[in-house]
């Protein structure tokens, strides 16, 4: 022999001439890397898999610009949905795998496993540069060994280890970027158009409420709009001389009012910097990977940022043939400044203010001529006199208020594997994770929530500890070179603990000292301890005949502290099989078939996340009654509740054809039964007649069955594969059908605008139907509830048009099914183009079908003089009804305009713009998720500098988002809701990677 072929799994093979001494450095090979994937409690060759597993390698992760590594899952695999995407600094996105298997939204999160043990921390605390791969386990065959928390899928995250080279390598990565809003704001009226719309609203309010004629109401609106409704005049005319008789603005805005857009005072261009230094080495008996990282983000909203220091050491040692051990250490320190009120309809929510503040209220105080009022230092004075804000100013408050969270995380893992005769091996692993979180919320004494009590400081302190212990016995055996058996039995114990204390003091003594001792009056102090424990026994058997037929079975028995001792244990299992058809004689010589495989599996996995830590017990709230200790019953005992169980069928075919086209087509059917739900009890059961639902008496119950079924299709092709040019294009699609199969006694459970009902999706809208606008009166019409006809007539809310009755208020309207929030199909489109050392990658994500209740648009289309004076309007309000069309009569066949916009009327706005399907809009979207360009300098240029490689890269995350309406964020939630909060950020990044 004259040549020698050197190969290693995950590395490119090399052929070299035989010499007495040979030095070989193998390069990573992403295609070969696919041969071995991380699975539950081990690894396996990809061709042997009987379950549905998608792998995201570090090459794909490195192209993405995300703080949380889970953000890289978006668009990376079929069956995976990602919402709440990158916007708030330090916030991880929300992930769903193959639908929604429970009625409790927080209980649909997948299980995250890092280096073989469950991870309960914040995913943003993991350094993405330390991640080698992520395996997404989507069916029961792949996930059943994590039985107790695998019902919603599992994401296995594997961190990097020392690589196979003959010398240490060092990698330095530096990234700088800026980011801002990735979704534009809604189209709203400017100051002049807003004034005219408000005049019209005042006019119609006088007509409907006071019975004035159109002329009288118009004159009244001109004379009283400023004094009664707006409370601010920024024009060069007297309050009662701003409009003509038709409501057209005749005055001009005073010069100097250039501070009417509150977004300018609250938002900014954010900044992102990310630095990582890693070292890797390995030898015959050891491998070591270490890294340190620093990340700093300034949010696109002022006073928000995120800072992270991270470090990791992963080491393995093999002193002899029969022993292998390792120790992994990781730690992070994070600091996050945030706004805890960045959701909802609150004056302390900056997003609420920037969206709804009418464009006639300035940020700063102005003189009568429009010029700024200045303080003794020549600085602008913040305006705290706006009637809309109730004498508050969010831009002013954000200068002084502070909300801060500091977390410290330290984790360690040690393992040892002893290889025994007869193919046996024993592995013992222990993992300990400790973290502390100290949160501080300061409200200043000058303005806002702290102004009435001299300032206040709230402190929250959390301590977490997670311990996981595993003992695993493996057996691998082969006979006659075609029979391969792998077996495993294991035991695992999991323990989670949390200690929590909080308190609030008021009355700040010394300005600027944000410690509890500097606030002299205690308002409250409380705390709690929680724990969650699981004990598990598991086993797996795999059989492979001649690399053609693969059979696998697994079993796990879990005991959870969340259930009563009589129902504590749950049994979960899976069976799967696959057929590698390419290895059959009838396909071996078919050149255009490179790979062809069929697989099928069935299994049952569990979920206990829908019940609290002590859900089976009767719980009491500890409080005071007249200054004395008191107990208030919070929930009834539920000794009969048991595990949610998800039964999954998975069938797929995959392959590669013509040495170009990779494909995978699969069908899945997940049925989750015995769903856990916290039922609020009626007064007859001992509940309390309080408005606050938190204080209602509850009891956990297993109440129903939900089905998620659909198809996953994945295609990618090597369109060009030449020496210098390579181009791979891909597309994947997931078709999902969600359905409630069973509820107790078949009874519906109404919740908000949606309804749990057999035969419908868990996120299907069930709300009042908007019939259209009466073109004679400009009134909104709704489908009448026949049982409410008499009451509607008595209230003057009944209209008969051409023989059909309609309600003019939803109090007498009928609810109807109005479509689901869930999409019909979602997926991604990708392109990877390379020419020599240049690489250009693009990723698009899309979703088709589904509806969102656009509450923000609804608020911008409604007007109300009481409680919301000065609220901004959407530009569509200009198309509202303003008088009956010519020739319109009571019997006109087109009297109802189904797409009309009702009149704007301060007095009747709550009925004209009531909650209904009028505000439902398509959730379909297309996002240019990622664009990245990189160039690797030729190695010969770097050789004399002692540099192994140097790569320059530039990228954009969330380049644009196309939706049905400008301003809409369809990825805010899975349930079709919306809020005034963070939207996806557009991130521009420039980076440099140097390898030594």
How should these model regions be labeled?
Residues 252, 449, 560, 847-946, ...:
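Extracytoplasmic gating/loop element in the C-terminal half of outer-membrane beta-barrel translocons
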Residues 1-312, 317-326, 332, 411, ...:
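Short, small/polar-rich motifs associated with maturation and membrane association
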Residues 171-252, 720-821, 861-865, 872-896:
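Conserved small-residue
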Residues 61, 108-109, 308, 314-323, ...:
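Extracellular/periplasmic, surface-exposed regions of secreted and cell-surface proteins
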Residues 19, 25-29, 83, 98, ...:
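A structural detector for beta-sheet-dominated domains
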Residues 820-855:
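Glycine-rich, aromatic-lined ligand/substrate-binding cores of catalytic
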Residues 46-47, 145-147, 165-166, 180-183, ...:
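Switch/connector loops and helix/strand junctions flanking conserved nucleotide-binding motifs
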């Amino acid at each position: 022999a004259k040549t020698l072929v050197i190969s290693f799994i995950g590395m490119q093979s090399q052929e070299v001439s035989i010499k007495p001494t040979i030095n070989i450095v193998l390069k990573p090979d992403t295609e070969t890397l696919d041969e071995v994937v991380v699975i539950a409690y081990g690894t396996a060759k990809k061709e042997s898999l009987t379950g549905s597993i998608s792998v995201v390698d570090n090459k794909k992760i490195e192209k993405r610009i995300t703080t949380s590594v889970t953000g890289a899952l978006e668009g990376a695999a079929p069956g995976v949905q990602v919402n709440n995407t990158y916007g708030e600094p330090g916030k991880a996105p929300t992930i769903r795998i193959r639908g929604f298997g429970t009625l409790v939204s927080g209980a649909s999160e997948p299980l995250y496993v890092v280096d073989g043990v469950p991870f309960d921390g914040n995913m943003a605390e993991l350094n993405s540069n330390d991640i080698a791969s992520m395996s997404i386990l989507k069916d029961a065959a792949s996930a059943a060994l994590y039985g107790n928390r695998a019902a919603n899928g599992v994401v296995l995250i594997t961190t990097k280890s020392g690589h196979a080279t003959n010398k240490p390598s060092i990698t330095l990565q530096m990234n700088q970027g800026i980011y801002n809003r990735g979704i534009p704001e809604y189209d709203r009226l400017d100051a002049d158009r807003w004034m005219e719309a408000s005049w019209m609203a005042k006019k119609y309010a006088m007509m409907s409420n006071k019975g004035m004629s159109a002329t009288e109401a118009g004159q009244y609106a001109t004379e009283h709009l400023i004094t009664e409704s707006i409370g601010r005049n920024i024009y060069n005319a007297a309050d009662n001389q701003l409009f003509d008789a038709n409501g057209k603005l005749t005055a001009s805005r005073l010069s100097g009012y250039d501070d009417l857009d509150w977004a300018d005072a609250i938002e900014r261009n954010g900044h992102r910097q990310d630095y990582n230094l890693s070292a890797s080495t390995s030898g015959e008996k050891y491998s070591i990977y270490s890294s340190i990282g620093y990340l700093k983000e300034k949010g696109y909203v002022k006073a928000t940022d995120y800072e992270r220091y991270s470090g990791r050491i992963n080491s393995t040692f093999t002193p002899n043939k029969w022993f292998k051990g390792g120790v992994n250490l990781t730690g992070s320190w994070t600091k996050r400044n945030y706004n805890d009120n960045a959701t909802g309809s609150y004056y302390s929510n900056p997003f609420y203010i920037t969206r709804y503040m009418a464009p006639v209220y300035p940020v700063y105080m102005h003189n009568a001529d429009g010029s700024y009022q200045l303080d003794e230092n020549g600085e602008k004075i913040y305006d705290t006199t706006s009637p809309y804000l109730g004498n508050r100013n969010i831009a002013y408050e954000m200068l002084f208020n502070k909300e801060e969270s500091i977390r410290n995380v330290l984790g360690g893992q040690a393992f040892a594997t002893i290889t025994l005769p007869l193919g046996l091996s024993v592995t013992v692993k222990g993992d300990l994770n400790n973290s502390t979180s100290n949160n501080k919320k300061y409200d200043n004494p000058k303005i806002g929530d702290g102004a009435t009590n001299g300032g206040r400081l709230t402190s929250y302190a959390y301590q977490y500890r997670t311990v996981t212990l595993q003992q695993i016995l493996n057996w691998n055996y082969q006979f006659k070179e075609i029979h391969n058996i792998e077996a495993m039995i294991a035991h695992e114990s999991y323990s989670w603990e949390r200690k929590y204390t909080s308190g609030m003091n008021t009355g700040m003594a010394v300005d600027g000292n944000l410690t509890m001792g500097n606030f002299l009056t205690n308002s409250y102090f409380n705390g709690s301890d929680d724990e969650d424990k699981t004990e598990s026994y598991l086993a797996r058997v795999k059989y492979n005949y001649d690399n053609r037929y693969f059979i696998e079975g697994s079993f796990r028995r879990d005991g959870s502290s969340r259930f009563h001792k009589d129902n504590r244990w749950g049994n979960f299992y899976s069976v799967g099989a696959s057929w590698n058809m390419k290895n059959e004689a009838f396909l071996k010589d078919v050149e255009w078939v490179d790979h062809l495989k069929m697989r099928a599996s069935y299994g049952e996995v569990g979920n206990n996340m829908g019940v609290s830590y002590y859900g089976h017990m009767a719980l009491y709230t500890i409080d005071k009654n007249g200054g004395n200790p008191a107990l208030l019953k919070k929930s009834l005992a539920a000794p009969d509740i048991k595990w949610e169980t998800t039964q999954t069928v998975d069938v797929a075919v995959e392959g590669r054809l013509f040495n170009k086209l990779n494909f995978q087509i699969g069908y899945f059917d997940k049925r989750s039964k015995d769903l856990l739900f916290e039922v609020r009890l009626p007064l007859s059961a001992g509940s309390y007649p309080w408005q606050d639902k938190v204080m209602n008496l509850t009891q956990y119950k297993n109440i129903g069955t939900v089905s998620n079924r659909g198809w996953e299709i994945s295609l990618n092709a090597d369109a060009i594969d030449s020496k210098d040019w390579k181009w791979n294009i891909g597309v994947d699609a997931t078709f999902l059908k969600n359905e409630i199969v069973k509820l107790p006694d078949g009874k519906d459970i109404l919740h908000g605008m949606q309804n749990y009902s057999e035969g419908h999706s868990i996120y299907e809208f069930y709300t009042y139907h908007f019939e259209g606008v009466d073109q004679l009166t400009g009134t909104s019409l709704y489908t009448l509830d026949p049982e409410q006809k008499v009451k509607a007539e008595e209230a003057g809310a009944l209209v008969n048009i051409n023989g059909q009755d309609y309600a003019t208020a939803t109090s007498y309207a009928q609810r109807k099914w109005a479509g689901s929030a869930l999409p019909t199909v979602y997926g991604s489109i990708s392109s990877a183009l390379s020419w020599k050392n240049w690489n250009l990658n693009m990723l698009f994500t899309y979703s088709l079908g589904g509806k969102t209740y656009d509450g923000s648009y609804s608020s911008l289309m409604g007007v109300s003089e009481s409680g919301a004076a000065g609220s901004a309007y959407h530009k569509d309000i200009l198309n509202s009804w303003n008088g009956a069309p010519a020739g319109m009569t009571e019997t006109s066949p087109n009297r109802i305009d189904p797409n009309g916009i009702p009149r704007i009327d301060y007095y009747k706005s709550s009925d004209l713009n009531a909650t209904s399907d009028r505000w439902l809009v398509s959730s379909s979207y297309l996002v240019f998720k990622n664009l990245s360009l990189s160039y690797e300098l030729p190695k010969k240029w770097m050789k004399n500098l002692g540099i192994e490689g140097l790569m320059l890269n530039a990228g954009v995350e969330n380049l644009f988002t196309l939706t049905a309406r400008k301003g809409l964020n369809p990825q805010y939630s899975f349930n079709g809701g919306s809020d005034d909060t963070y939207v996806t950020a557009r991130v521009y990044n420039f980076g440099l990677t140097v390898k030594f």
